[in-house]
Amino acid sequence: MNSMSENFKIRVIVGLILFIVAVVALYTFDGIPLKIMYGFFAVVAAIELLSFHKKKRTIYNIVLSLIELSLLVASTFFVSGASRIVIWYIIFGVPGYDIFAYFSGKLLGGKIFKKSRPFPKISKNKTWEGTIIGLLISFAMVTIFYLVRGEITTEWIYLFLPVLALVGDLFESYLKRKFNVKDSNEIVIKNKFFEKLEIIVGGSNGHGGFLDRIDSVAFATSVMLLITKIVV
């Protein structure tokens, strides 16, 4: 088995384990364990972000870092006060997009649109196949969940989560490009405990660090926090 196939298998296993852990945590003690877990991820991601400055430090990059840090803080605030229903919207709309975009990109990338890339200047690895399929499937999941709920409320705003997930992912890719960082796992904390956690969340073998794991969630939930303050 080649390294790509092995990494793909690891990604599947890690994804399933994290999903099971998240669901169990969501339905234990009113979801407090899940919110604590996300808060921990956000803190470590923030530390990773701060260490970007060892690569390239400019005023523009500092501003970008402050924006990303603000997103991490805002998203933690949003998730900490979110209900189980909202958490499910987030799971379907954000990690849902990330997962299906990744797998469809790996399996079908380049087979339909060949060498054409949707965002070549920001993320060369993203494919049209992965982006489109990821958006369609995650949007379908969020829409079905919304229709099954059958409530005509402000929950319709969560239908935009897949698009926000894509934008958040692109922003983090742009951030790494500006800092000349190929992957977030280049700048992880040099500590055995955190190194093991990096492996657990898929932060080795080119999968990125903690920031890669929650970049889409941070952006999407921050925007949701702003929208809910305006709409609700």
Report each predicted region and the residues it spans.
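Disordered, low-complexity tails and leader-like regions
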Residues: 1, 30-33, 42, 59
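Interhelical loop and helix-boundary elements at the membrane-water interface
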Residues: 1-16, 47-220
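Juxtamembrane boundary at the C-terminal end of a transmembrane helix
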Residues: 226-232
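The first (N-terminal) embedded transmembrane alpha-helix
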Residues: 8-25, 38
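Central hydrophobic cores of alpha-helical transmembrane segments in multi-pass inner-membrane proteins
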Residues: 39-49
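Short, hydrophobic transmembrane alpha-helix segments
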Residues: 21-35, 52
